[in-house]
A protein has these predicted regions:
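Domain-length cofactor-binding catalytic modules of enzymes
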Residues: 137-139, 151-152
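Short acidic/polar capping segments at secondary-structure boundaries
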Residues: 131-133, 143-144
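A short, hydrophobic secondary-structure junction motif
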Residues: 122-126, 189-194
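Short beta-strand scaffold segments in enzyme catalytic cores
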Residues: 1, 118, 122-129, 135-137, ...
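Generic recognition of flexible, low-complexity loop/linker segments
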Residues: 112-114, 191
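Conserved short S/T/G-enriched processing/targeting/catalytic segments and their helical context
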Residues: 1-110, 117, 144-182, 197, ...
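Flexible, glycine/charged-enriched surface loops at secondary-structure junctions
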Residues: 177-181, 190-205
Length: 288
């Protein structure tokens, strides 16, 4: 599910939300579709030119992430210039060059407005394999973060649901491929419980050899769906069994507590009356 404009409209796109920047690096997008399209267009153009001029040099995943962030910053700078400096007859260049003749308060105010200029929210996972191995980066309005050590990343409104599945499975970067495939699919399906997450699922695989990018087709996705549903049924059955065990256990505790209370009541009746607090305790004990 992608978001358009001010976030008031959400829609399921007819195109995949992942895009192969190279045959070894893929971008997965979440958030505002307009800003994502604008960034992606420029990033893809730069990468294509890089491949054309240096066809034998593999692009690093980190370089792709830095490029994505750099393009976003340029777009933000240009929009801020048009919205804030444009009405004043200024550009970034003339604003910087003319600061000596401007009041300090004016410069500080404009600088603050430029730095805090609002942009649409977006998140992008850039993942792939380069000559240094496999990598996972997340680029957003707030910078670049590397998730190589963690071994997984999730973005969008369903990210917490997906992350919880990876955490519960104790997933790491050394996990086997067969474990990761089903876990990834199941995490996506569980994330559909979150508002704004659509049912459409796109999957791909990169590696183990650099330059190998494979789109997971519909037949495989259908098989994964069957496996996921069987897993869900097993989990639901296990939960029902556990609830039944807890019910029987608490019932047993209640019965034992009732017997104990009845026994205490009987001893009180046999003894005549229950002693009050402090009763039978002498304030003047005699020496024997």
């Amino acid at each position: 599910m992608l978001t358009s404009g001010d976030g008031a409209v959400e829609f399921e796109p007819a195109f995949p939300k992942s895009f192969a920047l190279t045959n070894s690096i893929v971008a997965m997008m979440a958030g505002d579709s307009a800003i994502q399209a604008e960034i992606l267009q420029d990033v893809h153009g730069v990468i294509l030119e890089r491949i054309r001029t240096h066809p034998t040099v593999w692009i690093k995943v980190k370089e792709a992430a830095e490029l994505y962030s750099k393009v976003y910053s340029k777009i933000k700078q240009k929009r801020g210039e048009n919205a804030i400096l444009g009405p004043l007859g200024l550009t970034h260049k003339t604003f910087i060059e003319g600061q000596k003749s401007m009041s300090e308060s004016f410069v500080n105010q404009i600088t603050k407005e430029l730095l805090n200029f609002g942009m649409e929210e977006f998140e992008t996972i850039l993942t792939g394999i380069d000559t240094d191995g496999a990598h996972i980066y997340v680029v957003s309005n707030y910078g670049i973060h590397c998730f190589d050590t963690v071994g997984f990343a999730a973005i969008g409104s369903g990210s917490r649901h997906a992350q919880s599945q990876f955490m519960l499975a104790r997933h790491g970067r050394l996990a086997k491929q067969e474990e990761t495939i089903l876990l990834t699919y199941s995490s996506k399906k569980y994330s559909e419980a979150a508002p704004g997450v659509g049912e459409a699922t796109d999957m791909f695989s990169i590696g183990p050899v650099i330059g190998s990018h494979f789109i997971v087709g519909e037949p495989i996705l259908k098989d994964l769906e069957k496996m996921h549903r069987r897993r869900v049924k097993r989990e639901e059955a296990a939960l029902r069994k556990s609830v039944k065990e807890v019910h029987e256990y608490t019932k047993k505790l209640q019965e034992e507590a009732a017997k104990l209370a009845k026994g205490q009541q009987a001893s009180v009746i046999d003894g005549g009356s229950a002693p009050t607090d402090g009763a039978g305790v002498s304030n003047n004990p005699k020496k024997g």
